[in-house]
Every structure is written in C-alpha cells, then in structure tokens.
C-alpha cells in the first residue's frame, strides 16, 4: 500500500473508495447534478468535477476509467479513456463523461461516475539502434495472431 495525499474541495462528498475488498480501482463521485445529452447533441463530452485534488508520489500515475455498470446499463463512458493524472498535477480531478445512448442521462451530486486506478511506472531512456532484434512475431499486427 502507498499513502496518497488528498484534499477534499467538497467535504460533504465521500473520499474515493474501493467498492469491494478485491477492487483495483476507487470510485470517484460527482460534485454536481448534471444532465448529459445523448451522443451527438453536444459534440463531445461533459466535464464533471469530482471535488478532490491528490498528490501522487513520484513514480506513480492515476488513470480515470469508466464504471462498467454505468456503461452497460446507461451507455455512459469516459470520453478520453483512460484519463491520465500525472504525479505533478495538483488541480481538481475532472471526468469527461459521454453519453452513447439515445436518451438524456441525469446525474446526481454524490453518484459514482468513474474509477481511479493508481499505478506505479518506470521512466525510460531511449537507446537508439540501427535495427531492432528479431522476434517470432516480427512486424505482424492488427489481427496477425488470430481472432
């Protein structure tokens, strides 16, 4: 486990939390009531504030991901999936939601709208070569390993 600093902009909302003991990602909550028009009516997503700021340790990132239930039942997803939060970002976390259904979606303040997955990462150093080593797969892509 790692310790992550969090600042609640809206103290009436719960902290992001894990829905179950085995959950990998934390639920994020909407800070506002909102209406999300059907796909195509607004030409993109609607940016929803979550009411939190976080300070990830160096070497960590967070991904904002859709909630599977909202996607399956209502057609609601995160437009820029995954949304990337870097360790040096200190602003409020926002979720860019999109409605792929054909009816408006009414979101309520305090509802779970997305998930936050915190991951450790490594930075790279490029080592330029004249030619990459060969593999069995080679340059095969886009279905080359079968359907």
Curated annotation (Swiss-Prot):
GO molecular function: dUTP diphosphatase activity; magnesium ion binding
Keyword Metal-binding: yes
Alphabetical list of InterPro entries matching this protein: dUTPase (IPR008181), dUTPase-like (IPR029054), dUTPase-like_sf (IPR036157), dUTPase_trimeric (IPR033704)
Keyword list, A-Z: Hydrolase, Magnesium, Metal-binding, Nucleotide metabolism
Catalytic activity from the UniProt record: dUTP + H2O = dUMP + diphosphate + H(+)
Pfam families: dUTPase
Single biological process term from Gene Ontology: dUMP biosynthetic process
Cofactor(s) named in the record: Mg(2+)
Positions that bind substrate: 67-69, 80, 84-86
EC number: 3.6.1.23
Entry protein name: Deoxyuridine 5'-triphosphate nucleotidohydrolase
